[in-house]
Amino acid sequence: MATDGASCEPDLSRAPEDAAGATAEAAKKEFDVDTLSKSELRMLLSVMEGELEARDLVIEALRARRKEVFIQERYGRFNLNDPFLALQRDYEAGAGDKEKKPVCTNPLSILEAVMAHCRKMQERMSAQLAAAESRQKKLEMEKLQLQALEQEHKKLAARLEEERGKNKQVVLMLVKECKQLSGRVIEEAQKLKDVMAKLEEEKKKTNELEEELSAEKQRSTEMEAQMEKQLSEFDTEREQLRAKLNREEAHTTDLKEEIDKMKKMIEQLKKGGDSKPSLSLPRKTKDRRLVSISVGTEGTVTRSVACQTDLVTESADHVKKLPLTMPVKPSTGSPLASANAKGSVCTSAAMARPSIDRQPSHGDLIGVSVPAFPPSSANRIEENGPSTDSTPDPTSSTPLLSSNAAPPTAQTPGITPQNSQAPPMHSLHSPCANASLHPGLNPRIQAARFRFQGNANDPDQNGNTTQSPPSRDVSPTSRDNLVAKQLARNTVTQALSRFTGPQAGAPPRPGAPPTGDVGTHPSVGRTSVKTHGVARVDRGNPPPIPPKKPGLSQTPSPPHPQLKVIIDSSRASNTGAKGDNKTVASPPSSLPQGNRVINEENLPKSSSPQLPPKPSIDLTVAPAGCAVSALATSQVGAWPAATPGLNQPACSDSSLVIPTTIAFCSSINPVSASSCRPGASDSLLVTASGWSPSLTPLLMSGGPAPLAGRPTLLQQAAAQGNVTLLSMLLNEEGLDINYSCEDGHSALYSAAKNGHTDCVRLLLSAEAQVNAADTNGFTPLCAAAAQGHFECVELLIAYDANINHAAGGGQTPLYLACKNGNKECIKLLLEAGTDRCVKTTDGWTPVHAAVDTGNVDSLKLLMYHRVPAHGNSFSEEESESGVFDLDGEEESPEGKSKPVVTADLINHANREGWTAAHIAAAKGFKNCLEILCRHGGLEPERRDKCNRTVHDVATDDCKHLLENLNALKIPLRISVGEIEPSDYGSDDFECENTICSLNIRKQTSWDDFSKAVNQALTNHFQAISSDGWWSLEDVTCNNTTDSNIGLSARSIRSITLGNVPWSVGESFAQSPWDFMMKNKAEHITVLLSGPQEGCLSSVTYASMIPLQMMQNYLRLVEQYHNVIFHGPEGSLQDYIVHQLALCLKHRQMAAGFSCEIVRAEVDSGFSKKQLLDLFISNACLIPVKQSPVKKKIIIILENLEKSSLSELLRDFLAPLENRSTESPCTFQKGNGMSECYYFHENCFLMGTIAKACLQGSDLLVQQHFRWVQLRWDGEPMQGLLQRFLRRKVVNKFRGQVPPPCDPVCKIVDWALSVWRQLNSCLARLGTPEALLGPKYFLSCPVVPGHAQVTVKWMSKLWNGVITPRVQEAILSRASVKRQPGFGQTTAKRHPSQGQQAVVKAALSILLNKAVLHGCPLPRAELEQHTADFKGGSFPLSIVSSFNSCSKKKGESGAWRKVNTSPRRKSGRFSLPTWNKPDLSTEGIKNKTLSQLNCNRNASLSKQKSVENDVSLTLNLDQRLSLGSDDEADLVKELQSMCSSKSESDISKIADSRDDLRMFNSPGNNPVFSATVNNLRMPVSQKEVCPLSSHQTTECSNSKSKTELGVSRVKSFLPVPRSKVTQCSQNTKSSSSSSNTRQIEINNNSKEENWNLHKNEHLEKANK
């Protein structure tokens, strides 16, 4: 047993070990049970179950088989021989309580413990198995879901591939279509090019054809002239032969008469015997009836004299009178007339056969046929004054007078015996006097000539214009010559009479105009003809035959003959009518200018007057087909009758008839024919200065228009303003100046109606009836007032015209003037005291008439114009009282003055019951209705006969006006509280802005008033924060309550109505209208919440920074305690920080804390010790031993960019970031003692840096602060300037938003674009230190109507701020990589010539691209202000060479590196506006610690020297080279700026041809010289093109196609024309517009050169 027990003991000892190992193994497996797979879990389970079963079997076996061993083991050691064993056995057996432990180990207890442990393990295993099964089920489900997702994924992938395939096909199709379309575009472009080429060819062909056509016309004209000359020569020769025959016949007749007389004398002698008769040989001059005198200009001059005898012939045969021709010398006196060219003319007229006019040739002697007349019972003189042609002689080298003049001669009557019969007539020829006005004439004659000459370009009666050759007068020929006019008017008779006297002067000059012939006309049916000043006949008509012209009798002229005017009667048939043995002479209608005088006593009057147009003096009426000769000649004598052999009534007895017309006309205007019969002509030749083509409508008809009697002629002269004719007619005796025609129009009426003030004055002086009315009752004053002729009105009123005369319909002059809107006439009538209340038969008043036409000025005059007191002129009264304003300005005086008219007149109703207000409202004349509404007595509720009020008939606009009739217009203003005027650059922020005017009506309630205030504020906020120029009406459709800047009605702190506080929604007992009237509230002020209330709404409105961003900045300060605001200079950092500090202070005070703001201004001398003292003295840094303070401290550090951040703040970074006693920092005090300090939580630190970005060692500070960057191209700075300027415009326009086309909007948009483009260009240049914030542009002046003020302000800003900053930045930029010997400071003090040139180029480009571009001023005005901008002209063509090989490959982008040293900004260039004096504000301890030490002074002097160096003009004689690589980079950057398409285009500035020049540079010089010579491009060279952003000129480095080896390189630098340098003569400038394509010149190199040459010599020099 013992042996067995011993043998079994190891098994017992191993069993617990196995159990322990199994437990450890199970524990190990339990740890990883989650990661086992299903098969492993099954294996583990089976193993564990088998082990359990095995252990159970072992236990049972041990219990059954080894019982004895257990007993032996327990009790076998005890035997009776050992007392100690006995005692142990007794102890164990005798112990009754179970608490006694066995002496030895009990295996059963061990076994039971093992079994209990195994049971626990089994339970745990089963639990784990159940969990594993659940997880397995979950895993299976997830696998199923995964499979489903994978299937779905496969489907989606397939669909995606399918879609990709489809998209690929679509893309291919699109690419194919694009290629096709591009091909089509190219084809269309080619077609267009071909078509344009064809068009150019066609144009060239057309031009050639036009030139050939003009040449043909000229040749045909020459041939025609030659033909006419030949015809004239032929005619002349024929007439000369005929004249010779007539002379021979006359001589034969004289000889026969002498023979007969001698026979009679012999017979008488024989009969008389002793008595001797005293009869002497008769002379021809006794019997001479007609003498024709001709004075030629060249060669031999013949004088043709026609004589008539007393021969009485009973037969019907024609008796031919032989004229006498004698040679005469050319006149040594005036070329106008011979000294003895006097003559008397017979009064009898016979019929001459018709002939055809011919154009005479120059210098020919032309005889004029003169008919022979029987003696008549009365003496009669007819004379035509000679006139001359205006066509300059082509052979003459001297300029001719455009309107030449020749004086006519006056004759005394010749005494002739009577004949009872009129023998047939035959013709006699005499040459015309060739006359041209000599410069040395009498001034009176010249005055008459100036007055009477016609204007060749005045339109004729048919609306046509006759052309005359260009005037080349030696003497003045203006018809408006006042002296000549006055002399002509006052001395007509004297001037005319002087024409007949002998004129002393020089002989006729060569090249005078040719002479002209006058003759009868053929019978042609046309009634009008148009002739030209150039002598030529119409093609298609036969050339005219020279007319037959009577001569002049050689009888002396009376000194002052009586003035007579002829008036002929038109005849009904071709034949003349017999009566009283008197023959009426019917002149041919083809006669040229001349005069004809016939006594009109026995002639019937014609009822249809007709006057020629104004430019012509000729009153002769010519039928069509008869080209009136442009060579006007003198004609004297009887007019030939149409049919020979028929007697016509002779002229009535008249002892004295003198000429009345002098023709001074440069061209002959067409006039209507009186008849197509040869004899029935009614032309009148009178002295006339000019004729108006607007009258005598019968002229437009083409039928006969005979001229009637004297009164009708008087009317026509008055109607056409012919002062000279009118004065002559008024001098006649027995003329009825008050004669009225059929419609009752008198001469005064016609003159007043047509506005001829001089005629009105003449007629009134002649005592014409001033109140003579026509058939409708209209007086001359009515006609003048209706037509607006205020000068005539003034004259008529001065002559006591009836100003209140009512016509047939009751129309007064005032009514007619108002009806036609003639305000000057209205003013004159009102000042004369006319009655404003006179009514027409329809019940209309002048007020009705003015309103009916919608004429505001007339209505204002009627209502407000007061009659001036005696002795005071209207202008004085108007200047003193300012009664009325026709310009409609804002503060018009009629709003202050009282209307003159009564309420009865304003409310007077017409026949329909309509008042003036009814008419204005119905027609939509809102302005007139508004003026009527200003009258306190207006009754808008008055009803018409249809029971309608003014409101019922009004249009929508007028209804709105009537509804607001009694409304109070009270301005609504926004106030942001008080702003320190010069603190933090806020002096541009306005405290109050007027946003609109509220209309408060009687029926307005307080709810309506509250809604109106809210809506007005919302509209205003949205309008100023919108992107465009929206009007208030445009934003009302936007229902959002908040604007883009975050302001709304919730931002209101309080509202005051006048001085009474009011809140939205509050109601008073009185209505708003009564309340405003009672309290006399002149304005409504809305006060926005500000920092005092812990809000930032007022700050947002003042600065236009969005409210959300300001609140976010405040949150950052409260959260991080350490915040620094940085951005370009002028980004309002100081203002933002100050306002945030105020708001934070008031918030802390509202929470019960005391708070203090401490401001410190940092400069270059601000040390770390001063900063430490600042922190300690203000209890920001407190000793570790001291307890924290409850006081809040806000520290503001301004201008940190002036100091080194790393040096200044290095020791404070750690304690600022960790504010507790656990992270103290030791600082040494001034006494040398060191102590530990820490920053407490109640301290806030804010700083400002005027720098766009940090550089160098300052970046070490960045991670310890919260940084707020104010970028110029991001909010809030990007839109701040736009919103600010828009609000300024709205305030300037009293709350209204002007339209985008308004000049103010354009100039403001320009200022905004200048700021953006300037910063954009500076950013592209890589000079961030020169960027500008919007603060400098906030002071932009807004002056409506004065855009030049803004341009002047911009020039001051450019010169004072922008230019120095750009110069400093460019110089620092160009000297970054200088050698050590040429450091930055040295470069700044003494910049090289290349650097100066680059600076000037940069300034010029910036000025043209950023500033001047887009300026809305006209170019002329802009050029006046361009000189105010410094640096705008680039005086040198920078002609240095840059080689790519001179620059290392790795340095291509190195130029972009900026200067890392802090920029020391001087206060020299800051505007006075932005100075910040140290003014202590409320609740702020101003502890400015800035020190003006030597460093600042040194910086000032340094900056001053830099400016002086840069501003110096470079020595033009020096040769320049930009030697450094950085300068080359800068040049290329400037070049890319010029060629950039993203920036604004320089070429879009108004044609900058005068301002910008592009230069070529010769390539044979290593360095180009800039000389002072002024460039004057020859005319043959093409005009150089202005600098264009689209033009890039590329040069070749390998080949040069210019002849002398000159590379054609263009400069991209803008060079002003005035200061350009002389270029090589070999260089040529290409002409191009600013929009041309790129010019490629030997484009073998892709590198663009900016006036640079690749030259090895320069490279070596640069090295």
UniProtKB/Swiss-Prot annotation:
The molecular function GO annotations come to: protein phosphatase 2A binding
Which UniProt key words apply to this protein? ANK repeat, Cell projection, Coiled coil, Cytoplasm, Methylation, Phosphoprotein, Repeat, Synapse
Q: Which domain of life is it from?
A: Eukaryota
Q: Which residues carry this modification: Asymmetric dimethylarginine?
A: 498
Q: Where in the cell is it found?
A: Cytoplasm, Cell cortex; Cell projection, Dendritic spine
Q: Which segments show compositional bias classed as Polar residues?
A: 404-422, 583-593, 1619-1628, 1635-1644
Task: Spell out the Low complexity composition-biased ranges.
Answer: 386-403
Q: Which residues form a coiled coil?
A: 119-275
What is this protein's function?
A: Regulates the dendritic spine distribution of CTTN/cortactin in hippocampal neurons, and thus controls dendritic spinogenesis and dendritic spine maintenance. Associates with the striatin-interacting phosphatase and kinase (STRIPAK) core complex to regulate dendritic spine distribution of the STRIPAK complex in hippocampal neurons.
Q: Which PANTHER family match?
A: CTTNBP2 N-TERMINAL-LIKE PROTEIN, FILAMIN/GPBP-INTERACTING PROTEIN
User: What's the subunit arrangement here?
Assistant: Interacts with CTTN/cortactin SH3 domain. Interacts with STRN, STRN4/zinedin and MOB4/phocein; this interactions mediate the association with the STRIPAK core complex and may regulate dendritic spine distribution of the STRIPAK complex in hippocampal neurons. Activation of glutamate receptors weakens the interaction with STRN and STRN4.
Q: What is this protein called?
A: Cortactin-binding protein 2
Species of the source: Plecturocebus moloch (Dusky titi monkey)
